[in-house]
């Protein structure tokens, strides 16, 4: 059974890039904003969430807060993406409950390692 990854980004090009890259190894669902993603989460549970910070309707910060308040998604790993690379934004994401943060443009190999680290933490730790 393949792991399911939820992608949330208002930029269609980023969603398509991520879908193409990740669909080789994972089942991928993509949404264009936090509200649509929360509706989808009502009946679905991904193994990992990749979410943009700056989006219309509901930004990534608000999305994380909502996800962490729900019992069934409380421990789902979240990787945040942002076009703004600064420590303030990164720290805010971590404080709200994100496991990782990547600045756009990102290296797909780095994203791949972050996904593996979050989906298989014990196995990943044993690599070293």
Predicted regions: what is each one?
Residues 31-35, 90, 108:
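Conserved Asp/Asn-Gly motif in the active-site loop of CheY-like receiver
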Residues 106-116:
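C-terminal output helix
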Residues 55:
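Receiver (REC) domain active-site loop signature in two-component systems and cognate sites
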Residues 30-48:
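Acidic, metal-coordinating helix/loop segments flanking the phosphotransfer/catalytic sites
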Residues 12-29:
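Two-component/phosphorelay signaling modules centered on CheY-like receiver
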């Amino acid at each position: 059974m393949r792991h399911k990854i939820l992608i949330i980004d208002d930029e269609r090009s980023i969603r398509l890039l991520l879908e193409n890259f990740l669909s080789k190894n994972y089942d991928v669902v993509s949404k264009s904003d936090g509200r649509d993603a929360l509706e989808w989460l009502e009946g679905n549970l991904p193994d990992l969430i990749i979410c943009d910070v700056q989006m219309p309707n509901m930004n990534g910060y608000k999305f994380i807060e909502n996800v962490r308040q729900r019992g069934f998604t409380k421990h789902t790993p979240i990787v945040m993406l942002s076009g703004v690379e600064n420590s303030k934004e990164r720290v805010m994401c971590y404080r709200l409950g994100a496991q990782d943060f990547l600045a756009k443009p990102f290296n797909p190999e780095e994203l791949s390692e972050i996904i593996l680290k979050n989906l298989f933490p014990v196995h990943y730790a044993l690599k070293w």
